[in-house]
């Protein structure tokens, strides 16, 4: 969480992410090895240093942290859950072609509805998506 960070920080940049029309720089905090994402816009101020880091050494940690997020928002409690959400057939069938999360799995239920299985954290984006879906 950002309240534990002391600015300025050093981020080891891993990649650029395009999410919902915005471009982000994603990487790990040099000290805590925490996943950080910053939107690249006119308000972002950064300094490029000459320091180097071993990308291969931290890639596994980066991929693990990013893969547990539903979207790019931070988890509310830094935990990963097995989430099951039941949707009516019509709604579920319209949602199946979207890429919600890499763990997504749909299961047809005996009543004709579908159960969405996810293995990820709960954050602002998931809560917002569920509110809109209801």
Regions found by a protein language model. Name each.
Residues 5-8, 33-35:
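Short, mixed charged/polar active-site loops
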Residues 7-8, 17-20, 77:
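A short catalytic or substrate-binding loop motif that flags glycine-/basic-rich loops and adjacent residues
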Residues 13-15, 105:
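Short, surface-exposed charged micro-motifs
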Residues 22-24:
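Generic structural signal for coil-to-beta-strand starts
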Residues 26-125:
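Surface-exposed, charged, gly/pro-rich loop-and-adjacent secondary-structure segments at domain edges
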Residues 124-134:
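Extended Gly/Ser/Thr-rich low-complexity repeat segments
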């Amino acid at each position: 969480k950002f309240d534990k960070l002391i600015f300025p920080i050093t981020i080891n940049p891993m990649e650029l992410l395009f999410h919902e029309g915005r471009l982000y720089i994603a990487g790990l905090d040099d000290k805590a090895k925490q996943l950080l994402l910053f939107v690249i816009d006119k308000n972002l101020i950064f300094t490029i240093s000459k320091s180097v880091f071993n990308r291969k050494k931290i890639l596994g940690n980066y991929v693990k942290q990013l893969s547990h997020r539903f979207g790019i928002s931070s988890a509310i409690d830094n935990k990963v859950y097995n989430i099951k959400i039941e949707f009516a057939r019509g709604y579920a069938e319209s949602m199946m072609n979207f890429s919600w999360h890499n763990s997504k799995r749909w299961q047809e239920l005996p009543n004709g509805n579908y159960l969405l299985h996810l293995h990820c954290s709960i954050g602002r984006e998931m809560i917002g998506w569920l509110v809109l879906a209801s």
